[in-house]
Amino acid sequence: MAEFVEADNAEAIIARIETKSRKIESLLKQYKHVEALKTALEGSPPKTRDERCKSANWIVVHRALMAIKDIDGMLNALDVEYYDILMKYLYRGLSTGDRPTCDQCLKIHEKLTERAGLGCILRCLTDTINTV
């Protein structure tokens, strides 16, 4: 079972997410969109139940997701170990109801499902411990 940190450590997690956010912004300015997404997905989801941490991390992942233009190229460059966590964030994006976010998440979802198969969806939906 995953070990979760207590809420009093949430500030430390948020500080790490802020550092990650600055790195991602730098990568995006250099047009390294896939590298930014990989960086955003690293260490995700945060090992906490604190919603502030999860929301802060979602904002970082969302920023990287929205910058992706070449979905096939992104999936070719992305290691398969990232597929399940990416799928979780796609569902989080779909749950926002924001039209541009949903459109992007659906495009990526379609290509990711073709690549990773239905097992990726099932693992994402049945993992109730490591939520994003």
Swiss-Prot record:
Q: Tell me a GO cellular component.
A: cell projection
Q: What happens when the gene is disrupted?
A: Distorted trichomes and altered epidermal cell types.
**GO molecular function terms listed in the Swiss-Prot or TrEMBL record:** actin binding
Q: Which UniProt keywords apply?
A: Acetylation, Actin-binding, Cell projection, Cytoplasm, Cytoskeleton
The record's subcellular locations are: Cytoplasm, Cytoskeleton; Cell projection
Tissue specificity field: Expressed at low levels in all tissues with a relatively highest expression in inflorescences.
Residues modified as N-acetylalanine: A2
Question: Origin, by domain of life?
Answer: Eukaryota
Q: Which residues form the signal peptide?
A: none
Among the GO biological process terms of this entry, one is: trichome morphogenesis
Return the SUPFAM superfamilies for the record. Arp2/3 complex 16 kDa subunit ARPC5
Subunit structure and binding partners: Component of the Arp2/3 complex composed of ARP2, ARP3, ARPC1/p41-ARC, ARPC2/p34-ARC, ARPC3/p21-ARC, ARPC4/p20-ARC and ARPC5/p16-ARC.
Biological function: Functions as a component of the Arp2/3 complex which is involved in regulation of actin polymerization and together with an activating nucleation-promoting factor (NPF) mediates the formation of branched actin networks. Arp2/3 complex plays a critical role in the control of cell morphogenesis via the modulation of cell polarity development.
Family assignment from sequence similarity: Belongs to the ARPC5 family.
- Protein name stated in the entry: Actin-related protein 2/3 complex subunit 5A
